[in-house]
Amino acid sequence: MIDLTPEMIEFTQRLEPIARPGGHGRVLMFMGAGRGTGASTLAREFARIAAARSKRGVWLFDLDHAKNPQRKILAPEGGQSFDASFGRTPFWDVEPATARARMVARKGGNKLYVTEFQRAPGEVKRLNLRPAPDYWRAVRSSIDLAVVDAPGMSRAVLALVADMDGVILIADERRPGTDAIEARRAAIEARGGIVAGVILNRGPDPARWAA
């Protein structure tokens, strides 16, 4: 396992403060600019390091609703679950509307929680993402930081970018694909999102950041 702690500590310091003045949290999305960029690993390590510095906790939202890989890594034993609705209409819905589904959070470490999407077998035919500004406002009021791990090759996640405080793109430094980065930046900005930065990730070597 690669220890990304020193690099992610530096990155969290660059994004200080983790929580905004007045007690309002932040919502940051990590998105790969292509396949195999390590975006999910960086999102998880960022959330873990940020949790150690937080007061009200950090939630890692895993948008891979089919496999829930982050929960399997951070909370492999399952354990107690918490409602992740924050008392608001969520950022997702299912078809048919009568299908039984919910999002919960499980404790993944000290002040760190990771989401898990649960569904009744065979009932959900389609899952959609949608803007939900009220939901994310409630998140900001309740916790210090939400880290949203978005599948980089999915266009569905663009429905959420306008509700984020920033989107951090992850690219492979060895083959960064400048055109792909710019295309993803344009798509995010066209939907009202803000690209807060680009991480050029190089596997076991230290990641490098660019504004």
Regions found by a protein language model. Name each.
Residues M1-V27, R48, G79-D83, E182-A211:
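C-terminal lobe/tail of nucleotide-utilizing enzymes
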Residues E45, N128-A211:
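Conserved catalytic-core segment of NTP-binding enzymes
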Residues Q13, R20-V27, M31-R35, R56-D144:
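P-loop/Walker-type NTP enzyme "switch/lid" segment
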Residues G32-S40, E173:
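Short, glycine-rich nucleotide/cofactor-binding loops
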Residues L4, M8, S40, K125-L129, ...:
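A conditional alpha-helix N-cap/helix-loop micro-motif detector
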Residues R53-K55, G109, A190-G193:
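Short, well-ordered coil/turn elements that cap or connect secondary structure elements
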Residues S40, Q70-R71, R208:
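Short acidic, gly/pro-rich beta-turn/loop elements at beta-sheet edges
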Residues S40-F61:
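A conserved segment at the C-terminal end of the G1
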